[in-house]
Amino acid sequence: MLLLGLLLLTSALAGRRHGAAAESDLSSKFSFPGAKEQNGVQDPQHEKIITVTSNGSIHSPKFPHTYPRNTVLVWRLVAVDENVWIQLTFDERFGLEDPEDDICKYDFVEVEEPSDGTVLGRWCGSSSVPSRQISKGNQIRIRFVSDEYFPSQPGFCIHYTLLVPHHTEAPSPSSLPPSALPLDVLNNAVAGFSTVEELIRYLEPDRWQLDLEDLYRPTWQLLGKAYIHGRKSRVVDLNLLKEEVRLYSCTPRNFSVSLREELKRTDTIFWPLCLLVKRCGGNCACCHQNCNECQCIPTKVTKKYHEVLQLKPRSGVRGLHKSLTDVPLEHHEECDCVCKGNSEG
C-alpha cells in the first residue's frame, strides 16, 4: 500500500511539471511582438561602440542575404575628433519587411542623434533607399530590429564617412528646414497643406511615418466633440417666411476663427489653422425691443473641445514638438436682439 501511494505521488508531481512547461510554451507561442519598445534606441545593453577614425560600414547580419529573426542590434559610432560630423549613406541594396499602413512597425533600421535623443528616421520595405543622414556632432546611433515573422533580404548596409564642418553664410529662410523658420513664416507654409500626412511629411521628410504613428497612438486625453443641429418645422407659407427671417437674422451661424488669434498663442502653431465655430451674427432690423438701435448678442454660450495638431519649438533642441491637443472654443448656442447698451445682464 505504501509503495502504491509513493507511485501515485510521483505521477502527480510529474504531471504538474509537464503542465507548467506546456503553459510556458503556450504563453511564449502567443506572445506578440507589439509589446516591444518602438521609438528611439533604448537598448544600451545591446549597444556596440565603434570608434571611427576612417571610412567604414555596418550591415545587417548575413547581408546581402536574409537576416535572422528576433534580432536587436545597436551601434554607436563615435568619431575620435570631436570637431567632425559622421555621414551615413545607405547601400543601394536595401530591403526589409514591408511597412503596415505606411508605418515601419516590425523589421526596421533606425538612426538616432545621441545628443538629444532625436530619431532622424526609421526605414523598412524595399521601394526606395533611405536618404543620406548627417550627425550634428561626432556621434550617431543606429538600431536594427527584426521580429519573429517574415525576414527579408538583402537587409541593409550603411557606409559611414567623416565630414569636416565648413562655416558658410547664414542660409536664407527659403533654404532653412521647417523647424528653423520663424513661426510666422512657418505658419504661412503650414496653411498650404490639405492633409495632416502632407504636413508631417513636409516637417519631417525622413521620419514622418514614425511621427504619424506617435501622433495617433491612443491616449487618455479628451477627444473633440461634435454638435448637432435640429431641423426646423415648416407648416404653412407664413410660418416659412417668419422662419426664414429668424434663420437669417440674429442666429448662431458658422464662423471660421484663427486658433492662434482666438487662443492668443504666439508661441505655437496649430493645424488646421482655423476651425468652424457657432457665433451670433446677422442684423436686428425687426428688433422687438423699443429702442433706436438693437444688437445681436449671445444668450447661451457653451465651451467645446476640438482636437488639433500642435507644433511647438523645443527649447534648445532642434525640431518641433508635435502632439495632438484639445483646444477650448466658445460656441454661441442661442442669440437675441437687445438694445445696445443693455447687453449686460
UniProtKB/Swiss-Prot annotation:
Residues 1-22 form the signal peptide. Disulfide bonds join C104-C124, C250-C294, C280-C335, C287-C337. CDD domains: CUB (cd00041), PDGF (cd00135). The keyword Signal applies. GO terms for biological process: platelet-derived growth factor receptor signaling pathway; positive regulation of cell division; positive regulation of cell migration; positive regulation of cell population proliferation; positive regulation of ERK1 and ERK2 cascade; positive regulation of phosphatidylinositol 3-kinase/protein kinase B signal transduction. Gene3D superfamilies: Cystine-knot cytokines, Spermadhesin, CUB domain. Residues 46-163 form the CUB domain. Keywords: Cleavage on pair of basic residues, Developmental protein, Disulfide bond, Glycoprotein, Growth factor, Mitogen, Secreted, Signal. It is found in: Secreted. Glycans are attached at N55. Pfam families: CUB, PDGF. InterPro entries: CUB_dom (IPR000859), Cystine-knot_cytokine (IPR029034), PDGF/VEGF_dom (IPR000072), Sperma_CUB_dom_sf (IPR035914). The record marks K225, A226, R231, K232, R234, V235 as: Cleavage. GO terms for molecular function: growth factor activity; platelet-derived growth factor receptor binding. Proteolytic removal of the N-terminal CUB domain releasing the core domain is necessary for unmasking the receptor-binding epitopes of the core domain. Cleavage after basic residues in the hinge region (region connecting the CUB and growth factor domains) gives rise to the receptor-binding form. The keyword Glycoprotein applies. Belongs to the PDGF/VEGF growth factor family. Growth factor that plays an essential role in the regulation of embryonic development, cell proliferation, cell migration, survival and chemotaxis. Potent mitogen and chemoattractant for cells of mesenchymal origin. Required for normal skeleton formation during embryonic development. Required for normal skin morphogenesis during embryonic development. Plays an important role in wound healing, in angiogenesis and blood vessel development. Homodimer; disulfide-linked. Interacts with PDGFRA homodimers, and with heterodimers formed by PDGFRA and PDGFRB. This is Platelet-derived growth factor C. It comes from Gallus gallus (Chicken). The lineage of its organism: Eukaryota, Metazoa, Chordata, Craniata, Vertebrata. The gene is PDGFC.
